[in-house]
Design a protein with these regions (language model features):
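Repeated scaffold domains used in trafficking and secretory/extracellular systems
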Residues: 117-126, 161-175, 219-235, 291-301, ...
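Blade-level signature of beta-propeller repeat domains, shared across WD40, Kelch, NHL, RCC1
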Residues: 541-613
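Surface-exposed loop and turn segments in beta-propeller and other repeat-based domains
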Residues: 157-165, 208-226, 276-292, 327-350, ...
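Blade-loop segments of beta-propeller domains
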Residues: 117-124, 132, 138, 143-189, ...
Length: 613
């Protein structure tokens, strides 16, 4: 497919000046965005737009969403993780929320970076502390310019080219550490640490491998028996120990595969990074799982320890000269779900057990089980006790099942309410995962996803998005449903921006076939903005998520057409040179804390964001 010009739904000029406050940040109430945008969930649907490659700029319109800022997320900083949205779930708590500013429909534009090297548009994006985008590339990992017309590689690591290996980097659970090193599990059961920048933050053309540990071999030595599961996920705890879990995206208990949970001691990692010899037999500790039990998701970590959800249980683990299981809480599952007679889908779910990675708050662990109906559970962080539980998405139309596979959004307001947004994923999973010879740890589209969904779009997945609040009371906790959207089918791993107060997604209008960016009101669940992309099937983003840029003005969405989309606001213009457009990739919006404002010499109270161009 050929490259094309940016897609516009509005003109290029704003009623705000460069280096001033954006009008969205200053105004208390503004009209919803117009043109191809839908003002609310109950309003008349937007007119069908032409396919993206045929779209041309339309006449200017005014309007933007009012800011509904929330308190920043309650995530204590991990001293061993990068101070950025450093993993696929944005932080070590797996909140799938960001404190970054995201677009508000201020003369919105969609820009495209076209992929000419990789087999797909970047399916995962993490940012280091310098603002570099770290993405998968040809089975390896790279730092790339995602805003260039053609996605440009600045530096990379190729297992085949640089390490003589046939393995792949497993990108889903790769992350950035506090020194901006890339920490990544591999398909051959190793964990690597890669140095990608120099001391000044300049990108190295070829990344340096500074650590390489065969986790499977070390774990087998510690366990004293063979492991028949593969390495799935890794994360640092708050003491710098590297936790790992074996498993896959679907683990059948009856197959009796042997798996483990465990960690590599921080002291051993530091010794290796310092060029010293270390005895891994004294530094790798494991917790043997019952045969048939394994992880199916990522690991969360807080000062309390590492939280791991297997297909059977939820664990809180600590490093204490060995793996200390602080608590283990079992949960319900009816097993892997697949489409049956009378269903409107052909695929199924993904996991055998709970499908979403566990998410933490300072006091709770949140996850969904895989019962029928599916339940949202809240566990006490200290004891593992189930303190609240409620069915979710239990009133869908006939012909649809429920599988919560995408990580839930969890937002703790710091005042006793934890809001969880769950999204149905059923139908997107490959029914072939039930094949006894299938390796569900292989992270490829062909292995994981239903072919009919890839070709026919979101008509082939079940709908359902719901917000449930867990509220602290005098007697404990109670859960209540706040809103439900049974008309939305989303597989894009929705994101919450605390800076704007909105939920961001990517859906397909099943009437027009149009793939769209969508913004929901966090409080009401109403659709307050849509922006059309294309009605061609290849604009399915294939459940690989959306990613928030660190400029305060970019929401990235990969597609199947080798195009990485980014939604941006034209929030700034040059009043004395109106014929010249400001490069939106050189404009930024950041939440300015009162403390930082005072340190920078500001007087008075911060009224808005800091906008620069």
């Amino acid at each position: 497919m050929k490259k094309r010009n940016p897609i516009y739904t509005a003109g290029s000029f704003l009623l705000a000046g460069a280096l001033t406050l954006s009008m969205a940040a200053c105004s208390g109430a503004q009209a919803p965005a117009e043109a191809t945008q839908t003002p609310s969930a109950t309003a008349t649907p937007a007119a069908t737009a032409a396919p993206a490659e045929e779209t041309t700029p339309s006449a200017p319109v005014s309007g933007a969403l009012p800011v509904k800022a929330l308190q920043p997320k309650q995530v204590e900083e991990n001293p061993y993780m990068a101070k950025s949205d450093a993993n696929i779930h944005h932080d070590g708590y797996n909140t799938d929320s960001t404190d970054e500013i995201l677009p508000l429909g201020i003369y919105p534009e969609i820009h495209v970076s076209y992929e000419t090297t990789n087999a797909n548009a970047s399916p995962a994006i993490y940012f280091d502390s310098y603002g570099h985008a770290v993405v998968p590339l040809l089975g390896g990992i790279a730092i790339r310019d995602l805003n260039a017309e053609e996605t440009k590689t600045l530096g990379y690591f190729s297992p085949k080219q640089h390490d003589g290996g046939s393995y792949l980097i497993q990108s889903s659970y790769t992350f950035l550490d506090a020194e901006n090193r890339i920490v990544c599990p591999t398909s051959n059961n190793h964990v690597l640490m890669l140095r990608a920048t120099d001391e000044e933050g300049n990108v190295l053309p070829e990344f340096e491998k500074v650590l390489d540990i065969d986790i499977k071999a070390a774990a087998e030595a510690a366990l004293g028996k063979e492991l028949t599961q593969n390495l799935l996920s890794v994360v640092f705890d708050y003491d710098g120990n590297l936790w790992f879990a074996t498993g896959g995206f679907r683990i059948y208990p009856e197959r009796q595969q042997q798996g483990v949970l465990g960690y590599i001691a921080h002291s051993a990692i530091e010794a290796i990074l310092n060029g010293e010899q270390t005895d891994l037999s004294k530094a790798v500790f494991v917790y043997a799982l019952t045969p048939g039990e394994g992880a199916e998701n990522g690991i969360a970590a807080s000062k309390d320890g590492a939280v791991i959800l297997t297909n059977r249980n939820c664990y809180l683990l600590r490093a204490n000269n060995g793996v200390e299981a602080v608590w283990c809480t079992p949960y319900e599952s009816v097993g892997a779900k697949v489409s049956g007679e009378g269903d409107k889908t052909t695929g199924g779910g993904l996991a055998w057990g709970g499908g979403c990675s566990p998410t933490l708050t300072p006091n709770l662990v949140m996850f969904t089980d895989n019962a029928d109906p599916v339940n949202l559970l809240a566990l006490d962080m200290k004891t593992g006790e189930v303190v609240a539980k409620t069915p979710v998405l239990d009133d869908l139309p006939d012909g649809y099942q429920v599988a919560i596979e995408n990580s839930a959004i969890v937002y703790d307001d710091g005042a006793g309410t934890v809001s969880t947004i769950v999204c149905n994923w059923f139908g997107a999973g490959n029914a072939g995962l039930a094949d006894p010879n299938n390796d569900s740890s292989i992270q490829s589209y062909a292995n994981i996803y239903d072919q009919n969904w890839l070709l026919k779009g979101n008509a082939m997945i079940a709908p359902g998005v719901e917000r449930v609040d867990t509220v602290k009371t005098d007697s404990g906790y109670e859960m209540k449903s706040i809103w439900t959207r049974n008309d939305l089918s989303d597989t894009a791993i929705m994101k919450l921006s605390t800076a704007t107060g909105y939920i961001y997604g990517y859906v397909q209008d099943l009437t027009t076939g149009m793939w769209q960016y969508i913004i929901l009101d966090f409080e009401t669940g109403e659709t307050v903005f849509t922006m059309d992309v294309s009605n061609k099937y290849g604009y399915n983003n294939m459940a690989i998520g959306m990613y928030t840029g660190n400029s305060g003005n970019a929401l990235y969405c990969p597609t199947g057409y080798l195009e990485l989309l980014r939604l941006q606001d034209r929030f700034v213009y040059l009043p004395e040179l109106p014929y010249r457009e400001v490069d939106l990739d050189q404009a930024a919006r950041n939440v300015l804390a009162q403390e930082q404002f005072a340190q920078d010499g500001g007087e008075g109270t911060v009224a808005s964001w800091r906008n620069t161009a």
